[in-house]
Amino acid sequence: MLSPTSVQVRRGEFVCVIGPSGCGKTTLLRAAAGFVKPSSGRVLRGPYPVAGPSREVAFVFQDYGRALLPWRTVAGNIALALEAGGVPAAQRPARIGAVLETVGLQAHAQQFPAQLSGGMQQRVQIARCLAQQPEVLLMDEPFGALDAMTRESLQDELLRLVHSQGLTVLFVTHDLEEALYLGDRVIAPRTGPTAQRPSVAAIIDVDLPRPREQLGTREHPTFVQLRRQLYQYLGRH
């Protein structure tokens, strides 16, 4: 449940939503995807209300293991998006090959999910989303279950993909540093005893140079300052 909230995500922007479990992060994301209808208010994409799922919007789930079909190969899992989108069969191999190259999985096209590491499985899910050529990418804690080194590698890969494809991203995370590293803006909720229902309490601009780099960006004085500011804010709310 979310209190009345107004959030605007601009075209080509990377916006992170951060907060503890139960603060409404996933509800906001699911409403943006058209998976659920808000009980009040509206969700708009451009000037049009979101009435349901759209090919222009792709959703990356946290649980990559359940998002992939174990009896389909990597290429077969990516083909799902093309089949659902009505892409002619003759055009699918080229589209699949292109996104596999984009995420660096060309050599694994005929492997099954169980033969891949967690990070590689998540890249398959991202590749499947890219295959549908979306304008908006919604991501629900996609790297939360991965080890630190894999998570940082995929963060950098995601930033490269977003920049090269001109995607708009709404990214949910509970990791404060991940939000600051990836985002152009960070949305923080108001929770705690003074909030009957979670609501958006702060939207923080992340004024850090791009391209970003794991060590340099995290040691940047602005990053350190924003981390302290956001940590103190979340601690109070």
PLM regions with names:
Residues 131-135:
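A short, proline-enriched helix->beta-strand linker immediately N-terminal to the Walker B motif
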Residues 83, 90-108, 160:
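Conserved ABC ATPase "signature" region
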Residues 41-53:
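Conserved ABC transporter NBD signature motif
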Residues 72-83:
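Q-loop/switch helix immediately C-terminal to the Walker
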Residues 33:
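Helix-to-loop junction immediately C-terminal to a conserved catalytic motif
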